[in-house]
Amino acid sequence: MDRSKVANAFAALDAYARRSGAPKIADLFAADPQRFDRFHARFDDLLYDFSKHRLDAETLRLLLDLGRAAEVEPRREALFEGDPVNITERRAALHMALRNLSGAPMRAAGEDVAAMVEAEREKLLAFAEAVRSGAIRAANGARFTDIVNFGIGGSDLGPAMAARALSPFIADHLRLHFVANVDGADFADTMRNTPVETTLFIVCSKTFTTLETMTNAATARAYVAERLGPDAIASHFCAVSTQLDRIAAFGVRSDRVFGFWDWVGGRYSIWSSIGLSLAIGVGRDNFEAFLRGGEDIDRHFREAPLERNIPVLMALIGVLNRNVFGYATQAVIPYDQRLARFPAYLQQLDMESNGKSVDLSGARVAYETSPVVWGEPGTNGQHAFFQLLHQGTEIVPVDFLVAAKPTAADETHHRILFANCLAQSQALMQGRPLEAVSAQLAAQGLSPDAIAALAPHKVFDGDRPSSTFLYTALTPRTLGRLIALYEHKIFVQGVIWDINSFDQWGVELGKELAQKLAPIVGDDSASTEALDASTAGLVQAARARRAGA
C-alpha cells in the first residue's frame, strides 16, 4: 500500500470537513429535506441511519476516496481468502468460515477448512441437542437444568452477551450461567442457587492453561467431587480446547471435547465451539440462524459497493469522528434490554482489535486509533450519563440500536422505549439554543432576571452526532448480523489505520507480572525488595490487614 496516497486522501478530507463555516447537522437537515434518504443504508430489514453525523455528500465522497486509497477492497479479499492478515502471529483471521453454512470453499494456509468446520459444528450441535433432550444426563440420571460456562475474554463475553440477548429462545428447563473472574466470589455466587447435581460445566480454554478459567474449573471439579463423588466429574464436565492431553488429565471424556483453530481469535470465537453454552440453550435451529446472520453480513460486506456497504460506512464515519473531529470515545446504547451486554462485548471487540500504537511495519503511528467504547442500555443510561452526552464538554458519538417490534408482548412498554430512543438522537442533533430556552421560561412566567440566571444552565448545544440501527426484532439471525457488522467495521478501520486488528500483545505484560507476583503475594515471608515502592507498599499493607493489624 502507498501510504502517501492515504495521507493525501486524509488531508483532503480533513481540510474539507473542518472548513470554516461548515454547517451544523441540524442545518444540513434544514437545507436538504431528503437527507435521510441520502444518508442511510439498508440490508434486508436492517436499517443503518447515519444522517445525524457531520457530513454531506462531498464528505462522504472524500471518505470513500480514503477507503480506496487504503486499499480496503483488496485487503478485504485477502481476509476472505485466508491470507495471514494477522502478521505478528502469521495467521489467517478466518472466523467467517465458522458461519459458512453454504459450505463454499474457504482456505486457511492454503487448506480448504469448510469440511472440518462443518464436522466440528455438527458434533457440537448433536451434543447440544442431546443435552437439551435429556439423552445426555447428569450422574444421577436426571436431566441437566443448569449450564455453567468457564471462560474469560472472548470465551465469556461472547456467549454471555448472546445468551442474554437471546434469552426468549432458551429452553424453559435450562438456565445458563457464566463465570469469568478469578475472584472466587464469581463462582461462589453462581453456585449459591444452582443445583450441582444437575449442572453441566463447560471449560473454555484453547490452551487449557488460561489462569482464570483453569482456576475456576479446578474449583468446580473439587466442588463436584466433594458433593457428588469423584466418579461424577466425567458426567458433569465438557471442554472446548485443543489440548487433549491436558483435558484428559483434568477428567473430561474425549467425546465431550470440542475444538477450534488458531485462525479463530478469542474475540471472534462465539461462532465456534466456544458457543456451546449458547447452542445448548437455544438449540440447533436458533444457533444456525445466528450463524446465518453473520454469514448474511459476510456476503454483504464482500459484495456490496463501498458506498452502500454498511460495515464500510460505519468504519469511515468512525474514522471521521476519531481522526478529523477528535472524538475520543464511542457510546453504544441499545434500546433493547436484552442487548445489555452488547456494549461490553463491543468494547473488547473494538479496543482489543484496534487499540494499537504501531503500524504493520512496527513504526509508531502519528494518529489516533481505537476510541474508548462504552455504553449501557437505554432508557437506563438517560438517568445516568446522558447529562454528559447532552451538555458535557466532550462530544461523544452514539450508536443507538432499537427494534421496531418488541420481543415481549407488551406494546405499551415498547412504544415508550422506541420514542425515547428517537427523542435522544433528535435532541443530541438539534439541541435547544438560548433563545428557545429563554422563550420557554418566559412562557412559564419567570422574570427577566430569573430567566437570565437560569437559561444558560438549560441550553443544549446540539450538533452531537449519532447513528441508529433499526431492525424488526431481536432474533438469533438479527444478533448474528449485528455482531458481524461491527466485526467488519473494525477490520476496515484497522486497514485505514494500517494496524494489525487481530493480535493482542497488550494483554501479555500484566499476565507475566502477575505470575511473578503470585508467589510473593501468597507468602508473607517473601521479600518485596525487587518490587517498585508502590507495589511493595501495597503488598505489605495487604499482609498487615490479613494479619489483623
Swiss-Prot record:
Active site: 352, 383, 511
Protein's UniProt keywords contain NADP: no
Reactions catalysed, as given in the entry: alpha-D-glucose 6-phosphate = beta-D-fructose 6-phosphate
Enzyme class (EC, first level): isomerase
GO molecular function: carbohydrate derivative binding; glucose-6-phosphate isomerase activity; monosaccharide binding
GO CC field: cytosol
Location relative to the cell: Cytoplasm
Classification via Gene3D superfamilies: 1.10.1390.10, Glucose-6-phosphate isomerase like protein, domain 1
Key words of the record: Cytoplasm, Gluconeogenesis, Glycolysis, Isomerase
Family: Belongs to the GPI family.
HAMAP family: G6P_isomerase
Protein name in UniProt: Glucose-6-phosphate isomerase
Gene giving rise to this polypeptide: pgi
